[in-house]
A protein has these predicted regions:
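Long, contiguous hydrophobic alpha-helical segments, chiefly transmembrane helices and signal peptides
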Residues: 1, 15-18, 84, 92, ...
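Alpha-helical transmembrane segments and their membrane-interface boundaries
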Residues: 1-66, 71-75, 166, 170-178, ...
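Alpha-helical transmembrane segments of multipass membrane proteins
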Residues: 15, 56, 60-63, 82-87, ...
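Transmembrane alpha-helices and their extracellular/periplasmic helix-loop junctions
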Residues: 19-22, 34-39, 45-50, 97-100, ...
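Membrane-interface elements of multi-pass transporters and channels
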Residues: 24-27, 39, 64, 68, ...
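Alpha-helical membrane-protein architecture signal
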Residues: 29, 33, 80-81, 124
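Conserved glycine-centered short motifs in functionally critical loops
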Residues: 66-69, 75, 80-98, 102-116, ...
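Hydrophobic alpha-helical transmembrane segments of membrane transport and translocation systems
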Residues: 98, 103-212
Length: 212
């Protein structure tokens, strides 16, 4: 569940922030709205521009950290992010809330274990950012619809990419796609593997407990 939340944060958070701050401010409490307004006072760029610029700066730092070997690469990523973020806020180029949004987005993408998988969602983030920045919540919903529609049409070795969510399955099978139970406790096979024999084979043990 934590990885799913991290994936949603890394993909949707910038777009949702722009949608709320530009089009749907009425859903925010007054005190929070005033805090956002005070934080943006004096910033010369629009909220979309400052968020895109800071995201690109953090992507450059990430790439620099990957290219530099050893512990120095990690140090460049951490120290570089802190220095650039603090300098940008001190120079009144970006607001502190945008630095927080970018930092949370970066942390969410780091939780995703596969780097190529995470890179795809980092690119998708910019699409949601533009849609949310210029179309509001409706743009974010449109982006989700287009993304899910595309993923639903993909096949991996003849199996739908979003199995077990795109086919009519039991609650048990759908739940297995969200929760990871211990392997020894799994009684049933995945829905795409040998449907005629859904129960997994068990190891046979003799009376002394030895496996055969």
């Amino acid at each position: 569940i934590l990885r799913y939340l991290a994936l949603l944060t890394a993909t949707l958070l910038p777009g949702l922030y722009l949608a709320v701050i530009r089009f749907h401010t009425q859903i925010l409490p007054t005190n929070l709205l005033l805090s956002f307004a005070d934080a943006r006072e004096g910033v010369p760029f629009s909220s979309v521009t400052e968020l895109v610029l800071l995201e690109l700066a953090f992507e450059l730092i990430r790439e620099a950290g990957v290219r530099v070997p050893g512990a120095l690469g990690n140090a460049i990523g951490i120290v570089g992010g802190l220095i650039i973020g603090d300098a940008a806020v001190s120079a009144n180029l970006v607001s502190p809330i945008v630095v927080m949004i970018v930092a949370l987005t970066a942390l969410g993408s780091m939780v995703i274990p596969d780097e190529e998988f995470a890179a795809a969602f980092r690119l998708l983030k910019y699409g949601f950012l533009i849609l949310g920045g210029y179309l509001g919540i409706y743009g974010v919903v449109l982006g989700i619809y287009l993304t899910v529609s595309h993923l639903s049409g993909l096949l991996s070795f003849g199996i739908p990419y979003l199995v077990p969510f795109v086919e009519e399955q039991s609650v048990r099978q759908t739940g297995n796609g969200i929760f990871r139970i211990p392997f020894k406790a799994r009684k049933y096979r995945p829905v795409y593997a040998r449907k005629e024999q859904s129960i997994r084979l068990r190891k046979i043990t003799d009376r002394k407990g030895r496996e055969s």
